[in-house]
Amino acid sequence: MLVNNGGGLPQGDTDNPELIAQPRGGTPSVIDTQKELEAAARALSAGSSPIALDVERAQGFRYGSDPYLVQIRREDAGTFLIDTHALPDLSVLQPGVEDVWLLHDCLQDLPNLRQVGLRPSALFDTEIAARLIGLERFGLAAVAEQVLGLGLVKDHQASDWSVRPLPKEWLRYAAL
């Protein structure tokens, strides 16, 4: 089934999904200084679209589930990859992320986002939505394929995100 995704996304085909292997606009640099974080806060505050967030951890490599990278995407502001090892307090971003948050499996990421000082005012969980509409597979890649007709490269989700510097291929994955 052909899907017109709009918003600059390629047209998808749920029978033959298009593989998305590179982020639109390239891979952004990692934000690891307070000055860069404040610039991201200004950019996010200037936006008005919903905000997609994700967190990368080092589960299976480190004890606990601390966040090591927070990804934020706002269509009209850009993509931000934030090193929470270098910047453990992201509360300066809160005024710029007061719109609807888009998360997948929010129960995994909300505790980490709270840990770095971010709290949603409203959220939409794509995993819960997938379950509610009766999809049989509800992982992020499966939902993107079934609903948007787009395939996601999910090759580094189980990596040790505590490693520094983060490899370029991991950053590409994180920016998708």
Give the location of each predicted region:
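A cross-family signal for N-terminal binding/gating loops and helix N-caps
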Residues: 26, 34, 38-46, 55-80, ...
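Active-site-proximal helix-loop-helix substrate-binding element of RNase H-like nuclease domains
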Residues: 20-30, 71-176
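N-terminal accessory regions of nucleic-acid-interacting proteins
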Residues: 1-6, 10-51, 55
